[in-house]
Design a protein with these regions (language model features):
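P-loop NTPase motor module signature
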Residues: 1-278
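Leucine-rich, amphipathic alpha-helical/linker segments
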Residues: 272-301
């Protein structure tokens, strides 16, 4: 059996090293894609300036100095909405301000991916969905806020929360590259050259930073000891122990670590095991409606 893993952003040497231990040989084959030069420009954000205002100034500068559509990377839908509010009153009439994020309706996402009509320009305010998952045609200018929203385990609650952090150099390079897909482009970075050199090359792997309850429950359903599985990044021992203790407390795993009937029922729900247990245990009583409302509020947050 031959397995070919392809990615534009993977840490190839890490994959090769880990897979070589089990396969004996896992060579890296590099295929250089066609890219064009991208002019990197640094415009540091003032410490006390609101993000949407600094993004607005950068967009106006790019509209004056460069041609083509603009792709702006922001950490979340809240920042996108605020930046849109700033830009709508300050951009010329021939400029379309559109939003792109996974939380938006598909029709709006599809509209954001379509090039503007002849004679018009487009500013796409996007999350990191446009970094690797989607290609926005017609973009020759990228503006990178330099921050990202990533999941992290909250030790106080035992649940995963989203935190805003400084993005990595790898992410910045990937975002800048979006400006040079079809011709020479320009990338504005909202930080300075010195700060650029101090950024992490890569952010820590997500699986090492989040709650592992869902992962542990899924693996228990497979019936395979977790120690027999090969991971690119070693799972934190403390997080894994906490996950198994939590699943046992919820009676989703038995004393031997095997998945229970309740555990399989919870696994079928698209919820964290803690929340799924609330639903499964109260499905047939009078409070299930209240629980559904509580979960809807929690998940909306």
């Amino acid at each position: 059996v031959k397995v070919l893993a392809m990615s534009a952003t993977a840490q190839a040497e890490l994959f090769s090293h880990v897979l070589a231990d089990s396969l004996g040989d896992a060579p890296v084959v590099t295929s250089e894609g066609r890219t064009f030069p991208v002019d990197i420009r640094y415009i540091p954000k003032q410490r006390d300036e609101r993000l949407e205002n600094s993004i607005g100034e950068a967009v106006l500068q790019a509209l004056r100095n460069d041609d083509g559509d603009i792709l702006v990377f922001l950490p979340g839908i809240g920042e996108i909405n605020r930046a849109q509010g700033v830009l709508q009153d300050r951009t010329p009439p021939h400029v379309d301000i559109v939003r792109l994020a996974g939380a938006l309706p598909f029709a709006e996402q599809d509209a954001a991916l379509r090039p503007s009509a002849s004679g018009r320009r487009r500013v796409v305010l996007s999350t990191d969905i446009a970094e690797t998952s989607l290609t926005v045609k017609g973009v020759h200018i990228v503006i990178d806020a330099g921050i990202a929203r990533v999941p992290r385990l909250d030790a106080r609650t035992g649940l995963t929360e989203l935190l805003t952090v400084t993005s990595s150099r790898a992410s910045a390079d990937q975002r800048s590259g979006r400006a040079g897909r079809v011709r020479e482009g320009v990338a504005y970075r909202m930080w300075g050259r010195i700060e650029d050199s101090t950024r992490l090359a890569h952010l820590p792997a997500e699986i090492t930073q989040v709650d592992l309850c869902s992962v542990a429950l899924e693996i228990a359903a497979w019936g395979t000891p977790i120690t027999d599985l090969l991971f690119l990044d070693e799972l934190p021992e403390r997080s894994l122990r906490l996950a198994h203790e939590t699943l046992a407390m919820l009676q989703l795993l038995d004393a031997n670590g095997a998945i229970t009937t309740l555990g399989r029922e919870v696994l079928a729900l698209p919820l964290h095991p803690r929340l799924g247990t609330m639903v499964a245990r109260n499905r047939d009583n009078d409070v299930h409606g209240w629980i559904a409302c509580i979960l809807a509020a929690l998940l909306e947050e």
